[in-house]
């Protein structure tokens, strides 16, 4: 087993951050996915979905990376709104406004699949992007090495808060949806 995978599992269990050296960094996207798989195999937690970031070529070019960032959504990290988030359980996290899809049947991602209706539901979501790796270990990484490390680190998965269902998705401008966050008494939209 890869030492980095073992260290990431230990950090996940302890809700802690680890320091790594340059020799431990994954050398390729393939190695990153292998480390993530080892991480999942040792962690032995139920996978309930996937998180996929940087999906468009424009985003990838802007971030100077060579593909999307993929991680698994683990059952215990799916949180339902309304709730209070204990940030000590999601180390070094940032919030990202997202939306998520719940597929109601097996769906193959083939050309034209996006035109099928009735096989999924859409929900407002907040992702708590997290890491198990101390920022000191990341400070000098170029975008590709950072991406490979983030993939190995389960795609930066921390937790996801599922909000209200988005009805009539095809008729809604997603940019128009308001999200209210109460962070220690400070309400923002």
PLM features per residue range, with description:
Residues 2-189:
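Catalytic-core "active-site belt" of small-molecule-metabolizing enzymes
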């Amino acid at each position: 087993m890869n030492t980095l995978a073992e260290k990431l599992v230990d950090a996940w269990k302890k809700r802690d951050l680890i320091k790594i050296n340059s020799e431990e960094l994954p050398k390729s996207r393939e190695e990153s996915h292998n480390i993530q798989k080892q991480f999942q195999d040792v962690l032995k937690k139920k996978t309930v979905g996937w998180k996929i970031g940087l999906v468009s070529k424009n985003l990838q070019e802007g971030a100077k990376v060579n593909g999307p960032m993929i991680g698994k959504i683990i059952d215990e990290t799916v949180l339902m709104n309304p709730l209070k988030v204990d940030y000590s359980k999601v180390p070094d996290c940032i919030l990202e406004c997202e939306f998520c899809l719940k597929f109601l049947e097996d769906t193959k991602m083939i050309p034209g699949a996006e035109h099928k209706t009735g096989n999924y539901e859409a929900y407002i979501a907040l992702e708590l992007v997290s890491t198990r790796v101390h920022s000191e270990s990341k400070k000098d990484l170029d975008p590709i090495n950072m991406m490979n490390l983030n993939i190995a680190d389960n795609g930066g998965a921390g937790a996801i808060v599922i909000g209200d269902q988005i009805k009539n998705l095809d008729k809604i401008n997603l940019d128009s949806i308001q999200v209210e966050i109460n962070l220690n008494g400070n309400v923002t939209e």
